[in-house]
Amino acid sequence: MSRQHGETTTMKTLYIFLTRSGTLLSNLVYRLTGAQYTHISLAFDEDLSCLYSSTRKNGYTMFPAGPSREYLNRGVFLMRENIPCALYALEVTDEAYIRAKRRTQHMMHHGELYRFNSLGLLLCWMHIRWRRRRH
């Protein structure tokens, strides 16, 4: 708990899980950027029972991709051993936690609005702005 302006605010924790899976796209991003981690997932519980991210919808093929649920015992995590990773715990207010959870649920329910775009990834790396509808 923390105090803000005389009020008591309870805190919750969001978990940020960074990985480099060794997939074709992960290796490409790694080579282009040199970033230690190439993928980020969000979890709402400490045991990481369900991770949320923008990734492949089928654990075995790169496309289609978009908002997805990931599980540590399936897909890429099951196919590869010794995946480099880092886990961060971010304390947030109850209000921020609820907003993050609602936004994540909205993205999962309306995945067609949040498609992954590999061309956009390349343009982003090149610092080229690309305006698209609904983005």
Q: Where in the sequence are the language-model features?
A:
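Glycine-rich catalytic cores of cysteine/serine-nucleophile enzymes that process amide/ester linkages
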Residues: T19-Y88, W125-R129
